[in-house]
Amino acid sequence: LLSVCIIFAHDMITRCYLEITNVCNLNCLFCPKTTREKHTMTLDEFDTLTTRLAGEVRFLYFHLMGEPFLHPLLPEFIVMARRKGFTPIITTNGTLLAQRGDLLDALPHKLQISLHSHEGNGKDNPEQYIDEVMSFAKEAAQRGCIVVLRLWNEGGLNRMNDSILDMIADRQPRPWTQRYDGWKLTENLYVESDDMFEWPDLQH
């Protein structure tokens, strides 16, 4: 019921996308959605799959179609993944960060927060959303987690990008260090811009 997507590089597996849930709390316009039966991975399922992948995959991504922060066992999954030698990476829409302070004690190697999901749901006034995102992101970055605030909406719904960047600057003042894909705000904390993501055919 859930998906596993494996990425090869030079005949080696480098990345694996492990869908720990296909349930999401948003309805983003840019997301193709899934018609599969809703399912949330159990601890035994995660243990079995990661045992099979151990030693074969370096980067383990805990998402595909669902929102990983909805999973109550996410901290346990991260700890288990690290113990088995994976580098865990999570992408989230960021709406549940304020409710998941438990994740601050079980952070992944990298946390990618899709800020474009806010406007992608037709929402206005992102002040509270950005406040909650930045509060979690700054604390996570201070604890050694790489945090990437993503605005992957060039060519799509992006009229709020400038105001979102200004709100971020209110909480992490400029100047920022310019990068090829955005800015480095401070140690371990980045803003990344890109074109609107085009989903591959996942046979959903």
Model-derived features with residue positions:
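Conserved alpha-helical substructure of the radical SAM core
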Residues: L2-L111, N121-Q128
